[in-house]
Structures are given as C-alpha cells and as structure tokens.
Amino acid sequence: PIPINNWDVIVVGAGAAGLMTCLELPASLKVLLLNRNTSKVSSSRWAQGGIASVIRQDDSFDLHAHDTLKAGDGLCDFQAVEMLVKEAPGCVDRLQNLGMIFDQSSDQLATTLEAAHSRRRVLHVKDRTGRALVEVLEDHIENKKNILHCRGVRVTELLIENKECRGVQVLDGANLYWIQSRAVVLATGGGGHLFTNTTNPAQSSGEGIALAWKAGAAIEDLEFVQFHPTALKFYGAPCFLISEALRGEGAILVDKNGESPVKNLEDR
C-alpha cells in the first residue's frame, strides 16, 4: 500500500496532462500521481503528428483561431479556442525549456501541415512527438522529491465530503483502501474502448468521466468524440493509427470504389 494517507494533491492519470499538472504545481505541495498502468503505454505516448502553434511569420493567432472554428463547424467554445491559440507558443517554449527537442529545418523549428490548418504550424519530433513529450515530462517527475509516482494503482471511487472531493478509493493489487487529499485532479484521458474499433490503448475506457459523474460532477459535451479516419488493420492485431499529417501533406480518403466518403465534409 501507498505509505502516506494524506496528500495535498492527488493526480489521477499519467499521460501528458497528468504529468504536466504535477510539474506545474508548487514544489511545496505533496503530490501523489496515480497511474493504473504498470507499463509505459498511453495515448499520449502513442500520439504521432505534433503540436499546433503559431511560430511562423506568415501565420497569426487570428488565422489559427479561424481554422479551428471552421473545423468545429460553429460548435467550438470561442474562449477555449482563443486560449488554445494564444497560449500555444508559450507552451512550446515551456516544453523546450524542459528539454524537448523539436525537429529543425535550417535554423528554425520545422513545421508540417495537418488537416484543417491553412498554414504549416504543426511542430513535431519525427512521427513520435507524443513519446518524446512524455519521456521529457517523466524524467522531470522522477527527479521531483515532492511527487510520488505510483504505477499499477487503479482509482475506483472519489471521496466526497460536504460536496467537496477529499480523496480517492484505490485498488492496489489485492488491497482496496482510501487515500485523503486536499484536491484531486482527474487526467485519465479518453474513452476509445467504449467503441468496437479504436486505436487507443486498453486503458482508454472513460473511467475518469464515470468517476466524476458518479461523484455528482456535471458532465457536458459527451457527444463530441473524435473519430480518426485513418488506421491500419490486420486480422488478429489491434488497429494501428496512421498520422493525420498524412492527409495534411496531400493524401486523400477514398473507398474501394475510389469514391470519397467524406466529400460532404469538405467545407470544414
């Protein structure tokens, strides 16, 4: 069992969001990072394409926002888009300061084009951007004395007292017990395995959303699930994701008859 029962913050999920959350918290806080995996598999680690950010002279925040809103078909949260676009360059700088080395072209960061972007603004580390990102963050986590990273521990319930989340119940091997904290952050990723076909790893089962809903949290926008259109499928093997950068560089989607199944979406 985990030796300490009382923490300042418990972070559930050890993908990019959970790892970065731990690093951004003050070093004065005792942080427990719970990872249901014993291996290093995660959706973040499997991410291929890259990180979109305005860094070129021929680009702008307005263009990036316009592309995003157009791709969202008018359903985007405008404030969220504005935050995403304006804070992206600073996040890229932060990652570089942490030691992430993006691909270079001449004397500047290399950029590629992905679907819906009108400018080349996707920074990458070959086709293993997610892996590079997670490895940099994990290295920093392991060197933080205020952070304990526990693998193979699964959160089964949130502890709610007076309408506040004050801890979690965990399944740790054969042991089921409660851990208290002043705050809990759920960073458990998506729910690809709610569907028959997915390129997500097995732990992408929507557990974080279920935990929050069961605890009484308001859940919204569950209908917005991204369906990635390109994967490689072999009989008896899991689906292998084919990067979105493929289409950004000019590849087109066609069925066995050479017809486009997404023709009606071309305006977006």
Q: Residue ranges of each PLM-predicted region?
A:
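Helix-loop-beta segment of a Rossmann-like dinucleotide-binding subdomain
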Residues: 74-78, 108-135, 192-196
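Residues forming the flavin
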Residues: 1-66, 104, 126-268
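Rossmann-like flavin
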Residues: 71-111
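A short small-residue
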Residues: 65-73, 117, 189
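Short amphipathic alpha-helical patches
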Residues: 74-75, 88-92, 116-119, 208, ...
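Beta1-alpha1 glycine-rich phosphate/pyrophosphate-binding loop at the start
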Residues: 25, 49, 94-121, 125
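Short secondary-structure transition/capping motifs
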Residues: 40, 53, 77-84, 122, ...
